[in-house]
Amino acid sequence: TDVKESEFIAEGAVGR
């Protein structure tokens, strides 16, 4: 789990 991946997953889950 990287910071970039975490951000991407978080944005994806919260976004669409």
UniProtKB/Swiss-Prot annotation:
Post-translational modification: Conversion of fibrinogen to fibrin is triggered by thrombin, which cleaves fibrinopeptides A and B from alpha and beta chains, and thus exposes the N-terminal polymerization sites responsible for the formation of the soft clot. The soft clot is converted into the hard clot by factor XIIIA which catalyzes the epsilon-(gamma-glutamyl)lysine cross-linking between gamma chains (stronger) and between alpha chains (weaker) of different monomers.
Gene Ontology terms describing biological process: adaptive immune response; blood coagulation; innate immune response
Protein's job: Cleaved by the protease thrombin to yield monomers which, together with fibrinogen beta (FGB) and fibrinogen gamma (FGG), polymerize to form an insoluble fibrin matrix. Fibrin has a major function in hemostasis as one of the primary components of blood clots. In addition, functions during the early stages of wound repair to stabilize the lesion and guide cell migration during re-epithelialization. Was originally thought to be essential for platelet aggregation, based on in vitro studies using anticoagulated blood.
Chief location category: secreted
Cellular compartments annotated: Secreted
Assembly and binders: Heterohexamer; disulfide linked. Contains 2 sets of 3 non-identical chains (alpha, beta and gamma). The 2 heterotrimers are in head to head conformation with the N-termini in a small central domain.
One cellular component term from this protein's GO annotations in UniProt: extracellular region
Presence of the UniProt keyword Secreted in the record: yes
Keywords of this entry: Adaptive immunity, Blood coagulation, Coiled coil, Disulfide bond, Hemostasis, Immunity, Innate immunity, Secreted
Protein name listed in UniProt: Fibrinogen alpha chain
UniProt remark on domains: A long coiled coil structure formed by 3 polypeptide chains connects the central nodule to the C-terminal domains (distal nodules). The long C-terminal ends of the alpha chains fold back, contributing a fourth strand to the coiled coil structure.
Species annotation: Meles meles (Eurasian badger)
Keyword Coiled coil: yes
